[in-house]
Amino acid sequence: MKTLLLGMAAAVLLANSPCMADELKVLSAGAMQRGLVTIAGKFKEHSGNQVQIRYATAPELRKILTENGAAADVILAPNPTLKELAGKIAADTQKEIGGVGSAVLARPDAPSPDVSSLAAFKRSVLEADAIIYNRASSGIYIESLLKKIGVFEQVQSKIVQVDDGEAVAARVKSGHGKEFGFGGYTDVLHNQDQGGVKLVGPIPEEVQNYTMYSSALVAAAPSPAPARAFLTYLETPEAQTIFAASGVVSKKK
C-alpha cells in the first residue's frame, strides 16, 4: 500500500507540472507486452501521460540504444541485456520485474503434445512432425535443452527457426500434423489472445528456465520526470498484479 501511495503521489505531481504533455517512450522486450499494454493504460489514467511502447528482441534492444541513447525514456529487458547496456541506463535505477518461463504452443485443432513430465516431453519432441522456436534468448535455451536431454541430433531435421515470438505463432498457425512451437510463457499467452494458437502449457519444471526481466531509466531519457514516475508505478501492487496475470512470475524459482 505504501508503494502504491508513493506511485500515486508521483503521478499527482506530474499532473501539475509542465511535463504533463510529454509522451513517454518505452522500449521493451516482447515478453512484457501482454501486461505492459494494460499498465501503460493505467499509468495514463493516473498521470495523464501517453505511453508509446516499442517492442524488440534482446539483440535489437541493445542495437537501438547503442545507436541512439535517447531513443527511449524507459527500458524493460532481460537482466543480461541491461548489464550490457550499463553505460546507456541511469545508475541505480534498475528494478527487477520478474521472470518468464518457457512454454509450448500448438494449433487449437491439433492434439496437444504431452508436457506433463520430462519423459512425456521428450517423447512428444521425438514424435513431432516439426518443432518451431525463435532465434532470440528463449529459442537459444530450447536448443540447448534439446541437446541436454539427448534428442537434438534426432530432431534437428524437423527444427524450424524463425526470428521472434510472433513469427513462431505465425508458423504454428500455418502448420499441419503434429507440429508445435516454443516461446516465452507471456508471448504464448499474448498470441493465444490474438487467436490461431493455444497454450499447451509450460515445459516441465525440472528443465524450466526463467528469464529475469528488469526496468531501468535510460540515461539520456528525453522525458526523465515522467519516466521516473512510470518506474515508480511499475513497483506498485497494481502493476505487479497486472504483470502476474500476464504470466510473469514475481521472483526466480
Enumerate the predicted regions with their spans.
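Bacterial N-terminal signal peptides
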Residues: 5-16
